Amino acid sequence: MSSLSGKVQTVLGPIHPEQLGRTLTHEHLSMTFECCYCPPPAHQGTLSDAPILMKNLFWVKQNPYSNKENLLLSQEIEAITEEIMIFKAAGGGSIVENTTTGISRDIKMLKKMAEETGVNIISGAGFYVDATHSSSTRSMTVEQLTEVLVNEVLQGADGTNIKCGIIGEIGCSWPLTESEKKVLQATAEAQSQLGCPVNIHPGRNSDAPFHIIQILQEAGADISKTVMSHLDRTIFDETKLLEFAKLGSYLEYDLFGTEMLNYQFNQAVDMPSDNDRIKMLRLLINEGYEDRIVVSHDIHTKNRLLKYGGHGYSHILNNIVPKMLVRGISQQCVDKILLENPKQWLTFK
């Protein structure tokens, strides 16, 4: 049994689970996303290097990965700190920060934000998708990768003594690469040693979450303490969603606020609206899965910040919760999704 058993580990140290309050389970507060830059069409090429202005804001919102400045969330620390305070004023208590190795995790900055705002911040250990893996990461064995993950939780990350409180988001592509498979196997082994929560970023294919769960199970993971992220852009068929729900992971709808005509990473996909997301939550609740749902915004680009006319970290509390209540989701279920389920997930076994 880990010394962290029964506790939640924040960047400021362990806390009692009851101290979490309303929790966003998948956000980014300081990161860069240059790994996923998408060059714009030739006739719009100058927009890639343009500053974000009112006159190009619609274009940036529809093509968020084609504007280089938009991918540098770590430039907006002051604005993000202010927005965390707005989240707190709206009734928020904790944020799980899922930035891992490969997309510029800054755990020192997360500690500073937690100290300045009084909001609990839980940092993620691990590695993002294969495209961000270094040659040294790719050359590691499962045992070596496991040691890295365990050390980031027990000793500290990035050369500091600031410790991660989850493993994840662990990045997976579609199809899964060999390096990503090793990281998944290491994640399962580290989780079995630590009893810690895990968060997975699946590839953009409806079969990806199933494949990932199979690999984790075979490697000894605790699926009941594992979150499958981004289901709102991954599984659209209701029957398939309910089939996946039976596997026992937490079901994360974490793109609230993302309503766009153009989903750059998969042009064949219609990104659901927030109203569509609420419908899927209601379906899962009606089928008995209210204990397995968690929600968030996954803010990872500047355009989604309040500073740039976006929804910010308070969107779920200010705008989505009232709509959930109007649309047939009880206050008891809302509290489970925002309070109880994150608490159960984040508490070390």
UniProtKB/Swiss-Prot annotation:
- What family does the entry list? Belongs to the metallo-dependent hydrolases superfamily. Phosphotriesterase family.
Keyword field contains RNA-binding: no
Enzyme class per UniProt: hydrolase
What this chain does, per the entry, is described as:
N-acetyltaurine hydrolase that catalyzes the hydrolysis of N-acetyltaurine into taurine and acetate. PTER also acts on other N-acetyl amino acids (Met, Ile, Leu, Val) and N-propionyltaurine, but at lower rates.
Q: Which residues bind a divalent metal cation 2?
A: E169, H201, H230
Recorded GO CC terms: cytosol
Which species expresses this protein natively?
Xenopus tropicalis
Entry's Gene Ontology BP terms = catabolic process; regulation of appetite; taurine metabolic process
Write out the annotated subcellular location: Cytoplasm, Cytosol
Q: Name one GO molecular function term.
A: N-acetyltaurine hydrolase activity
Binding residues annotated for a divalent metal cation 1, in chain numbering = H26, H28, E169, D298
Q: Which InterPro entries match?
A: AryldialkylPase_Zn-BS, Metal_Hydrolase, Phosphotriesterase
| Protein name (record) | N-acetyltaurine hydrolase
